[in-house]
Amino acid sequence: MTAAISDRVREDIRLLGRVLGRVIAQQEGEEVYELVEATRRMAFDVSHGDADPEDLMVIFRDLDITKTNLVARAFSYFALLANLVEDLDDESVEADVSLRKTFAKLKREGVSAADAASVIRSAEVAPVLTAHPTETRRRTVFDTQTRIKQLLKDAHHGGDMQVIEQEMYLRMTLLWQTALIRIARPTLEDEIDVGLRYYKKSLLEQVPALNRSIRHSMRETFGLQLPDIAVMRPGSWIGGDHDGNPYVNARTLTYATRQAAKTVARYYVEQLGELERELSLSDRYSSCSKELLALAEASGNNWESRVDEPYRRAVYGMRARMKSNVDALERPEKTAGKKSSKRTPYATPEEFLRDLDVIDRSLRAHNDDVIADDRLARIRSAVTTFGFHLYTLDIRQNSESFEAVIEEVFAAARRVPGGKRYSELAEAEKVELLIQELQTPRPLLFPGALEVEDAFSADTTKELGIFLAAAQAVRDFGSRSIAHCIISMTATVSDILEPMVLLKEVGLRDVDVVPLFETIDDLRCGAAILRELWSHPFYREHLRARGDIQEVMLGYSDSNKDGGYLQANWALYDAELGLVELCREHNIELRLAHGRGGAVGRGGGPTYDAILAQPKGAVSGSVRITEQGEVISAKYGAPETARRHLEAFVSGALEASLLDTEPIADPDRAYAIMRDLAGFSGQRYQELVGDPGFIEYFTQSTPLHEIGELNLGSRPAARKQTTAISDLRAIPWVLSWSQSRTNIPGWFGVGSAVSRFVSAVPEKDRESRWQELRDLYATWPFFRSVMSNMAQVMAKAEISLARLYADLVDDPEVADRIYALIAEEFELTRRAYLAITGNEALVSENQRQARSLKRRYPYLLPLNAIQLELLRRYRGGDDQFLVSKTIQVTMNGLATALRNAG
């Protein structure tokens, strides 16, 4: 970043801060404004070491809740505005990663056109959007943010500052009086709508544009013209992921698929309207094909003003038909009483594409390639990418639930021999029975049995309803609308076969069943489970019919919670090594999906780096990665940033597939070092979470319970009503630690692991061990990514604040003991990182991030201080609505400021 750009960021933040201050003074009075300013000055003193965090706490100790709420809102809004400035700054700096640079690298390193084309033709790259409890901002807030961002752009380009500041004042006045978050717990429908918001903001335009750019890059770099392709096709979990979420049902799945279909159909109508206006070609000056003329004649548009404009007439008819698609998707109450359309809706995207191709061929046959390559090409690419379904909605449920459903269905069909219950069978017996059923063409139950009321328990009825709704979605919107059924906590072969039986029962044999390995033990056993699965001729033939492709998902969140940061990262990498080798041995293509969260403790970090950090052979052109929460907002909230992130995604996949991205001199030694480090780190992590006082410390020193109580997201915080860490969902686990600025899931245990690894040899040999670690950091993308992501999350931690959160624990002995463990390990890890990397600070390698953290730090402190004070009040019995609501404001403010907090 140049000094000029850095200065501009600083000036933009000051401008927005000044206008926000003016709004607060006007709306809430000078006293509140001065309170906010006094808080800000004290926070700066704390950040510069001129005051202690306790001094900041004093401001709020006896402050009434109304004023406390206003201060919390002020700093939360400022975090939101600071994000706008930094996002705008990011757009002005050339991206480190781009398709252009990647294709140049492929050419430079000797990749052939044939190899590149082979990977691209079979590639499937998918960002999969998922819900997140702190991403509940309303459309009004997003729209206001967008307008303020545009005003900043106007200021950068010489706009009238008086006019700009006045509109900023207007927009911020509206923003200040608009609730950032909903009062009620968001429904699944709310979360589905939030996910679709990003399609309207960026993805509808940018994903097809990216797919066209890949074709263009192939032509420009390798001289090879590829047909219309969709390397990237987005996915979603919102409305189909019912693992631990009792609110997902047939209705929400139907809502998700229909809203997605409506979104893309409306987009096509809008784009066809623009195309109709643009294709003003008159047959007095241009010619058209006979098939185009036939399309025009069939359009029903016989307006005298258009008698010489066959292209417009043709598009008019297409738009009328697509409008019928939209009408058919509207709810009955919205179309009741309206005159039904005379136009027949398009039955399939292929039918729609055929009409678009008629226009394309006609234009190109008459020297109008330049016209064909504009909006028409964009629409054709969108149809190739999105079809009529927009995104692929995944079904996800845990293996235990699938087994319970199978038990009831088999009991109803009397399919278990000897009068036994299915759950009483040995694993081998289960597998034999399941395969028998999968090979039997007849259904398990009589037609309509799945829809009979009270035929099954409420849980099983709901689960079967989801499968029936999925089958209806496929009939309505095509096979890509529901393409994956993911089994959480996969531990056996029967876990994979059980949902296959349910899918067969509802006619969804083509849906891919995807085992999700997520605990440390399951990751270690993943390859063995698949080896056993493939040993069954039925399943091997099943794979052969699918092109010998096996999709597997790896879970970053639960593995981290299970074994700690370093052990989880190595378990994932080692699992991939085993899967790659197994697939090579059996001549099967491996397609990996990665269940990553926004936070480093849930597998977060730069997507490009994460993809390149995979073992050789683990990508092969295809990769699916979940995206969520604040990360979605940061990546896809604007077209410019969306394009950057999408290009980085695809660039990583292409480079990992076609280049040697793992140049380790001695892989066996590198893997042995990682096994040692992972083992040592896991032991240290277990010492922490196994401490008798750990549960008390965790639940009382973080806002865990408040996350569950304060309407943050539609999903419950835990899978079961227990205090076990294993039953806690990963998002509240990571979010709780990030709120207390401890961030344990992103670093704990690494320092002890490095210390034990180095000290395991005589003192004279220890420098050579340090050098081994330095060499790995310099040459191995995986190790470098693990260490860099760790440094990022440590830089966002603040251990002095964690001490204040520890004071919330009832038992001071437990508080002191656990905090001392955490503080000691943090310092040990910090020193280890600096020694390995040679850096002077945790963020030395990323000066942009260093400046960002420095700017944000004084605005994070007040939010933590307010949260600490209000947690004391809330837990002490102060159940005023404004107390709980202000805690929620601080949570969202901190998550907004930290950006990848959960």
Curated annotation (Swiss-Prot):
It is an enzyme of class 4 (lyase). The active site is at residues 132, 561. GO terms for biological process: carbon fixation; oxaloacetate metabolic process; tricarboxylic acid cycle. Keywords: Carbon dioxide fixation, Lyase, Magnesium. One of its GO terms (molecular function) is phosphoenolpyruvate carboxylase activity. GO terms for cellular component: cytosol. NCBIfam families: PRK00009.1. This is Phosphoenolpyruvate carboxylase. It comes from Corynebacterium diphtheriae (strain ATCC 700971 / NCTC 13129 / Biotype gravis).
